Amino acid sequence: MIMSTIFALCTPWGKSGVAVIRVSGKDAAKAFLHFGISSSIKPRTATFAHLYNSKGEIIDEVIIVYFVAPSSFTGEDVVEFHTHGSLAVIKMILAELGKIFVPAGPGEFSLRAFLNNKVDLTRAEAIVDLINSETEMQAKQAIRQMSGALEKLYQSWRQQLIDILSNIEAYIDFPEEVNSAALANIGYLLNNLQESLECHLNDDRKGERLRQGIYIAIVGEPNSGKSTLFNHLAKRDIAIVSEYAGTTRDTLEAHIDVAGYPIVIIDTAGIRDSADLIEQEGIRRAKLKAENADFKIVMLPYEKRNVFNNEIMNLIDEKSICVLSKADNITEHELISIFNFSFVPISVCCNRGIEILLNLIKQRVEKDFQFCSTHPFITSERQRLHIQNTLNIVKNMDLELPMEIVAEDLRLSVRELGKVVGVISDEDILDNVFGKFCIGK
């Protein structure tokens, strides 16, 4: 495949101390001559230089890093210009590069890295996840995937299928020369692989949830302090807070970081019997959010601690954290037992109990989303689809059928696993993966 030499700004557009402009392709070194750099640039060494435009006017003083293929991110010759982050300077350099090279499209540098076998598709997805990560745990998950945790797992499964397929094809072609014990073991091997695939898929979508955010709905009766707590955790005034019950009608969301985990807290309408049609819709949405959330904070006002609210108490289950709100006069930090449920007393206005609540959230999240070194999480719907397809094929294999049919099923399963890592890559799959990147990556 013949590809043009491409260029793009790799750092965010805007004023900054330093900007990085990348060039990749077989003609990348021609940029030196174009910018009037007469001295030789040593590969993999930071070199100070002046850049000149086509009129011989100086553009900027820069640091140049030159990577010779295949020892670069893309596997091609790569030149990086580390310039001052002036918009004027960036525009002038990009304009000069545009005279001899082609602007890169979104994700095109990473696409070339994939095409040149520098990364597989799971690592490519991890790159964009790392760029988009906002919390420590999101970044750690992406880095684990970039290090090849998923690739190694999927390649090992794929190799197992290839080994089985090889034995069957050998039997088809040379039945008298194949050890019958090798064929007798196929059912056992496929059963083991099926169990591994099922275990991998039955992960409660932890990787995807960690990537997108862990949802926690705040629910309770009207005026129980839900919006006040929501604003306090979000550290800004998002929800309207008033003394009038039923102020919150719709759900509101805010992203926060709890011990490195990405949490999406949801403020909801107060749950009660209401004749107001709009409030009824808000209550319906509140219950739906509570049902679909990963966890929920169920709030009960301190002054109503002895009043059994059947509708609120019915919301409490194993994924609930119970909070006794407006406990302004409580100085102890111990949990309080109410109707056989343990409540943590908090006072937002006095800033009491909030750290205990956050620690409870941390404990719940850590328990459910703890990394496992031997079983990395699936992190995208694309991966899940192909793993599920592989499982379906393996599960439905009938070893009583002619070996030619079994061999074809094995080829299909090998192909599905190949699509996960990109060994077999349809164009629409590549467009879907790399189209999510920004220009310059």
UniProtKB/Swiss-Prot annotation:
Its cofactor is K(+). It is found in: Cytoplasm. GO terms for cellular component: cytoplasm. Its main location: cytoplasm. SUPFAM superfamilies: P-loop containing nucleoside triphosphate hydrolases (SSF52540), TrmE connector domain (SSF116878). GO terms for molecular function: GTP binding; GTPase activity; metal ion binding. Keywords: Cytoplasm, GTP-binding, Hydrolase, Magnesium, Metal-binding, Nucleotide-binding, Potassium, tRNA processing. It is an enzyme of class 3 (hydrolase). Residues 213-366 form the TrmE-type G domain. GO terms for biological process: tRNA methylation; tRNA wobble uridine modification. This is tRNA modification GTPase MnmE. It comes from Ehrlichia canis (strain Jake). The gene is mnmE.
